[in-house]
Curated annotation (Swiss-Prot):
Gene it is expressed from: greA
Keyword DNA-binding: yes
Biological function: Necessary for efficient RNA polymerase transcription elongation past template-encoded arresting sites. The arresting sites in DNA have the property of trapping a certain fraction of elongating RNA polymerases that pass through, resulting in locked ternary complexes. Cleavage of the nascent transcript by cleavage factors such as GreA or GreB allows the resumption of elongation from the new 3'terminus. GreA releases sequences of 2 to 3 nucleotides.
InterPro entries attached to this UniProt entry: GreA/GreB_C_sf, TF_GreA/GreB_CS, Tscrpt_elong_fac_GreA, Tscrpt_elong_fac_GreA/B, Tscrpt_elong_fac_GreA/B_C, Tscrpt_elong_fac_GreA/B_fam, Tscrpt_elong_fac_GreA/B_N, Tscrpt_elong_fac_GreA/B_N_sf
Protein name: Transcription elongation factor GreA
NCBIfam families documented for this protein: greA, PRK00226.1-2, PRK00226.1-4, PRK00226.1-5
Top-level taxonomic group: Bacteria
Xref: PROSITE patterns: GREAB_1, GREAB_2
Keyword DNA-binding tagged: yes
Keywords: DNA-binding, Transcription, Transcription regulation
GO BP of this protein: DNA-templated transcription elongation; regulation of DNA-templated transcription elongation
Family recorded in the similarity comment: Belongs to the GreA/GreB family.
MF GO annotations: DNA binding; RNA polymerase binding
Amino acid sequence: MKRIPMTLRGAEKLREELDYLRNVLRPEIIKNISEAREHGDLKENAEYHAAREQQGFCEGRIQEIESKLFNAHIIDITKLTTDDKVVFGATVGVENLDTTYRQTYSIVGDDEANLKEHMISINSPIARGLIGHKEGDIVRINTPKGKVRYKILQVKYC
């Protein structure tokens, strides 16, 4: 299977969620199933069926996270030689030269991407267009809205 790039922070968030699911939610669901069984007939026991459904979702998410972590290529940006270029894990300040709108993006793995937090996937058009360029460069990027010119204002590695 293909290794998936992931930042240290992204891997840590997944480990925290996995820990919560295994050590808090899973035991709670098992307790709920046990209590629901005590209420008698399981065919018409809504509490039992709800708890079993919740157990299925929990176990599925545990397997999904374990698989992601197993296949992750965790990249510590602080240990990379970057030559001041935009690379995976970098935080990049850009200005749209057509609108003068300024924005900062962190380039992360697919599973970490969250536009509300200004975290874009390494596979997004903007990230692909910025990779390999330096502060001060002007890049043309094909986006779903058409070609956009960006000036790279700042590149940070944290």
